[in-house]
């Protein structure tokens, strides 16, 4: 039994790392064991260093949010208010959990008779109960400030060292002498740090503000991590670094817009969101296909020719480009409403979500009048990174996470 299991695992491992699938013709994994120059060639063992680094990044994040982001939030006027617990009531709790969080008028009257409470009191109970589950604005601001800081720093680092790389200016050099392209120190740090950050996102999902797209984002992060790992082991790190940098370009603007929203700076929020939309569309609908897809599809075909994993990576990049087009359409819709109304309105991509300090009176009234209201629309994710900006009570509301990074990197959408 043990021998059969070992043989099965051996076959599975051999299939997973099949040279005929992952590498060009006449290239073997043994060929990439040589030292090369600098940090040598990418190896699977290098990926192991990602896990302690991910823990370090996660720890730095906790310290950053506690000692830097929180004081900044308080300074811009965000309150550190405790969540007020609603009066316990088993009957209403059962309805809230199992039936609806937004009872209609008929149900309210029935509960009123059953509990001998006024309809108004029951309305207030449900409103406070909803707010009890919603994250404080302070928490969301701190999360966005951390992501803003990381995205800005990693983008600056990436563009600084890529600027001096010949393959940044001539993408054909991503494929000359492939896969015998040794790692530089800067490229090694850049790739491993990015991969570690995505692993830290996996950890933090379980303590971050819970979104309706939790499962989707979990799967999205897993796929992004797998693709980024494979691209590293496969030594597609040059073009992978270009994709990283391009996807990092717009993310700081989104997080900045969300912070402005949480701080109730509506005009600044709208301005930043419109700038973000322009940056996203230019980078994803113009630069990505003309710069990235051109080199991965045509230049690589001419220089090294196709092989099985080449088709896989390009298929994923084409799917990513389709998502870019969909996301851009939704961003244009939201930006158009922002410009016409003077503020960011409901983002069709995102969950509508208020903090525990805010009350959703408009949604509540719509329910009582029989209109349908939703606590969210489909979220927008991507990359390889996601973003959710919404309007509640006529104010600029930023919610969710825009991780266009899922496979930026060959991701995830904060």
UniProtKB/Swiss-Prot annotation:
Glycosylated residues in this chain: 26
What this chain does, per the entry, is described as:
Ceramide synthase that catalyzes the transfer of the acyl chain from acyl-CoA to a sphingoid base, with high selectivity toward palmitoyl-CoA (hexadecanoyl-CoA; C16:0-CoA). Can use other acyl donors, but with less efficiency. N-acylates sphinganine and sphingosine bases to form dihydroceramides and ceramides in de novo synthesis and salvage pathways, respectively. Plays a role in de novo ceramide synthesis and surfactant homeostasis in pulmonary epithelia.
**Source domain of life:** Eukaryota
When the coding gene is removed by deletion, what phenotypic consequences does the entry describe? Mice are viable and show no apparent morphological alterations in normal conditions. Decreased palmitoyl (C16:0) ceramide pools.
TM ranges: 44-64, 148-168, 187-207, 214-234, 272-292, 312-332
**Post-translation: what modifications?**
Phosphorylated at the C-terminus by CK2.
Q: Where is this motif: Last loop motif?
A: 299-309
Keywords on record: Endoplasmic reticulum, Glycoprotein, Lipid biosynthesis, Lipid metabolism, Membrane, Phosphoprotein, Sphingolipid metabolism, Transferase, Transmembrane, Transmembrane helix
What are the boundaries of the region Disordered?
Answer: 347-373
Q: How does it sit in the membrane?
A: Multi-pass membrane protein
The UniProt record lists the TLC domain at 139-340
Subunit structure of this entry? Interacts with PAQR4; the interaction regulates the stability and activity of CERS5 and is inhibited in presence of ceramides.
| This protein's name | Ceramide synthase 5
The record's subcellular locations are: Endoplasmic reticulum membrane
Description of activity control: Inhibited by fumonisin B1.
UniProt note: domains: The last loop motif confers selectivity toward palmitoyl-CoA (hexadecanoyl-CoA; C16:0-CoA) as acyl donor.
Name the pathway. Answer: Lipid metabolism; sphingolipid metabolism
Q: Name one GO biological process term.
A: sphingolipid biosynthetic process
Q: Which catalytic reaction applies to this protein?
A: a sphingoid base + hexadecanoyl-CoA = an N-hexadecanoyl-sphingoid base + CoA + H(+); sphinganine + hexadecanoyl-CoA = N-hexadecanoylsphinganine + CoA + H(+); hexadecasphinganine + hexadecanoyl-CoA = N-hexadecanoylhexadecasphinganine + CoA + H(+); sphing-4-enine + hexadecanoyl-CoA = N-hexadecanoylsphing-4-enine + CoA + H(+)
Concerning SMART domains, the annotation shows: TLC
Which coarse location class describes where this protein primarily resides?
A: endoplasmic reticulum
Name of the gene encoding the protein in the UniProt record: Cers5
Gene Ontology CC annotations of this record: endoplasmic reticulum; endoplasmic reticulum membrane
- Which GO-annotated molecular functions does the record name? DNA binding; sphingosine N-acyltransferase activity
Q: Where is this region: Homeobox-like?
A: 75-136
């Amino acid at each position: 039994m043990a021998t059969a299991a070992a043989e099965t695992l051996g076959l599975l491992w051999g299939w997973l790392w099949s040279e005929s699938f992952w590498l060009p013709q006449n290239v073997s994994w043994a060929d990439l064991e040589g030292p090369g120059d600098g940090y040598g060639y990418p190896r699977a063992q290098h990926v192991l260093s990602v896990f302690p680094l991910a823990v370090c990044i996660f720890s730095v994040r906790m310290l950053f949010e506690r000692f830097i982001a929180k004081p900044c939030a308080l300074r811009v006027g965000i309150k550190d208010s405790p969540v007020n617990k609603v009066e316990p009531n088993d009957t209403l709790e059962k309805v809230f959990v199992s039936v609806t969080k937004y009872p209609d008028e008929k149900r309210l009257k029935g509960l009123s008779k059953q509990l001998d409470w006024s309809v108004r009191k029951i309305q207030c109970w449900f409103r406070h109960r909803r707010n009890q589950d919603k994250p404080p604005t302070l928490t969301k601001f701190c999360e966005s400030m951390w992501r803003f800081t990381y995205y800005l720093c990693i983008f600056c680092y990436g563009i600084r060292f890529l600027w001096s790389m010949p393959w940044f200016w001539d993408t054909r050099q991503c494929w000359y002498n492939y896969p015998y392209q040794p790692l530089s120190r800067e490229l090694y740090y850049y790739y491993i740090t990015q991969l570690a950050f995505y692993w830290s996102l996996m950890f933090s999902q379980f303590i971050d503000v819970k979104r309706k797209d939790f499962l989707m984002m979990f799967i999205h992060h897993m796929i992004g991590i797998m693709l980024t790992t494979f691209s590293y082991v496969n030594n597609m790190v040059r073009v992978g670094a270009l994709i990283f940098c391009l996807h990092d370009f717009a993310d700081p603007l989104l997080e900045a817009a969300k912070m402005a929203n949480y701080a109730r700076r509506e005009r600044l929020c709208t301005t930043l969101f419109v700038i973000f939309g322009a940056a996203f569309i230019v980078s994803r609908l113009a630069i990505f296909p003309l710069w990235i897809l051109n080199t991965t599809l045509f230049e690589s075909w001419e220089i090294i020719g196709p092989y099985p994993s080449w088709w896989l990576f390009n298929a994923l990049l084409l799917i990513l480009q389709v998502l870019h087009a969909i996301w851009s359409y939704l961003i244009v819709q939201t930006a158009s409403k922002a410009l016409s109304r003077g503020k960011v309105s409901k983002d069709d991509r995102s969950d509508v979500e208020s903090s525990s300090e805010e009350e959703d009176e408009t949604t509540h009234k719509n329910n009582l009048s029989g209109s349908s209201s939703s606590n969210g629309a489909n979220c927008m994710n991507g990359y390889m990174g996601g973003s959710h900006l919404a309007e509640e009570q006529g104010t600029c509301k930023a919610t969710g996470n825009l991780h266009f990074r899922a496979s930026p990197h060959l991701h995830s959408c904060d």
